[in-house]
Amino acid sequence: MTGTTARRTVVSVAVSAALACVTACTGPGGSDDAGHSTGPTGSARPSASAPASSRAPALTGPSADALRKVERATGRAGSARVESTTVMGRELSLEAAGALGWDDGLTGTLTITYTGGTTAETMRRLGTTAMEARYLPDAYYARMGDEFAERVGGRHWIKYVYEDLEDLGGGAGAGFADQMRNTTPNQAVKLLLSAQDVRRVGEETTRGRRTTHWSGTMGGATAQSVDIWVDDRDLLVKKVERGRTETGELTQTAYYSDYGVRVLAERPPAADTADFKELLASQGS
């Protein structure tokens, strides 16, 4: 492999890896026609937006009433601080922390630290062990390390415009775009409202706060379980989602606090930013 070919390969892998990392830390994503979520590597993930025909009938009764109160309260809060850990089989494990808002599309900033997996090893080879992700209503930005920047004309940021992601082949990009634009704490509640066997587990103490624990399972080819812990204001304190991927078990645990916190997310300097479509196109030139 020539030096130029190697450079092109590394850049292409890095662009896909950054997409996988940012998508993973926001939770299970959009689906293809079979109700599976697909990533840059083609691995199926439990879907938060499976076709309506594959879902169980909407939950009714006292449990549904309680969960809809949580959905409304969390949605109205508009923003929160987030801490999460995600493991996607042998492919990727990471930690994320920051603040996200959802009043007008997903906005905010997360610091993502790679803790293991083949994707993390790819990023480490590029001199990147952590990444800053900035979410804006029309796009998100991933900050790479200096070694990556040296390969792409000194630019550190990769820009992913959601409309451009939707144009990617195979439906995977549309799933990513939908996931990142619609990821909010109350999405986990919406999943429970369509679950087959929702149950109120009981009262528990979560990070020093009294909470009510709810649990449910979504069926289909890739079974997915969701657990949430809700405080006395009907706000999520903790969420755990579990499922399977082609590379192994998927588990995400997220904690939410400081609802209503002010969220800032600025666009990186244009001179320090490369569009992902341009990067991928240049690799084939």
Swiss-Prot record:
Signal sequence, start to end: 1-20
Domain of life: Bacteria
Alphabetical UniProt keywords: Cell membrane, Lipoprotein, Membrane, Palmitate, Signal
Extent of Low complexity compositional bias: 43-58
Lipoprotein among keywords: yes
Lipid attachment site numbers (S-diacylglycerol cysteine): C21
Keyword Lipoprotein: yes
Lipid-attached positions, N-palmitoyl cysteine: C21
Gene3D superfamilies on file: 2.50.20.20
Region (Disordered): 27-63
InterPro entries (UniProt xref): LolA/LolB/LppX
Membrane topology summary: Lipid-anchor
Any one GO cellular component localisation term in the record: plasma membrane
Subcellular location: Cell membrane
Protein name: Putative lipoprotein SCO4650
Organism: Streptomyces coelicolor (strain ATCC BAA-471 / A3(2) / M145)
